[in-house]
Structure formats: structure tokens, C-alpha cells
């Protein structure tokens, strides 16, 4: 529920211009990369939302706009696998290999400083390339913004579970980003602790 709420909240602010909706999809993929440590899980969360957006905007499933939105979203998910250490399992495997072979660790912040600029550049390039390859049929989608607003309103206020997940996610992000600066806990350990907290009853 929280991932859908974040996606709709972002898309509700981008308006009805198709170019802004595409930018919104990239922003959603970027934000979720910070709190969902799996590209597969992020794609599984975002794709149904984007399918709903396409339907809400009244676009044909075989339209260029639909293809543009879906392909851009999935590629944005992959792009941010590079920029954020905890965004993909293969990053953690690579770091484990470096630790074992070279005795060198890479903190979350060090990874982000080194790799995030590449993901940002790729995201910008992705937008322009996709808009060039699959130009949408129209510049505006009448009623699209209202449809997103209605979907967001239908979700109602945040539930206790969503608030708890958001609090744990933001805390975990803060702990990840201060790894090696304020504490010595590695990303894997703090992730396991966060999962344990989410599994607690109540």
C-alpha cells in the first residue's frame, strides 16, 4: 500500500502533461529504490500502478504513450540499481566479494557518492531518448490528473501499518547513509534488524 501511495502522490503533482507523467514515473522508480531493496519487487510494485495510470488516462494499451510509460518505468528501475548500494541484491554480492578478496568494504554513502551521479545522468538520458523514440500521441491527457487524485483519495488516510513501514524505512535509510561515519553496522545487519522490526506483531 505504501509504494502505491508514494507513486500516486508523486503522479498527482506532475499534472496532465504526458512529458510530466513520464518524468513522474522516473521519480517514482528513483524514490522506491531508496526503500525497496529489490529491483524485481520495485518493478512488481510499479508496473500495476502504471497500468492503472494508463487506464485512468484513457490511453489505449497499444498506444505509444502506454509503451513509453511502461518501458521508461522498467528501465528507470534498472538504472537505479547502479546508484544505490541497497537497491539490488547483486550489489551486496559484489561488495561481499570485495570484502573477501581485498579486505575492503564500501559504505552506503561511499557507493551513493560514486554511483548516484551515473544513475542520475542515465535517468536524464533515458527521458530524452524515450521521448524521442516513442513520442506520445498528445501533449496533454484530459482528465488524467483528476483520475490520479481520485485514486489517491480512494486510498484514504495512511494506515498504522503504512506509517510504521515509512518510519522504519526512513530510519533504515538514515542508518545506511551514516554507515562508517556515525556507526560500524553494515547494511546487511541493519536491513535484517529492520525486517525483524516489521515482522513484530502490533
Model-found features: residue ranges?
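Hydrophobic alpha-helical transmembrane segments
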Residues: 19-27, 70-71, 112-116, 166-170, ...
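Membrane-water interface of alpha-helical transmembrane segments
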Residues: 12, 16, 64-67, 155-162, ...
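Structural signature of hydrophobic alpha-helical transmembrane segments
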Residues: 42-46, 118-119, 186-195
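Generic, well-ordered alpha-helical scaffold segments in large soluble proteins
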Residues: 9, 13, 30, 52-56, ...
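Juxtamembrane and boundary regions of transmembrane helices in multi-pass small-molecule transporters
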Residues: 2-5, 39-42, 57-156, 182
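Membrane-embedded alpha-helical segments and adjacent helix-loop junctions characteristic
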Residues: 1-60
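Alpha-helical transmembrane segments of multipass membrane proteins
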Residues: 29-33, 80, 118-126, 130, ...
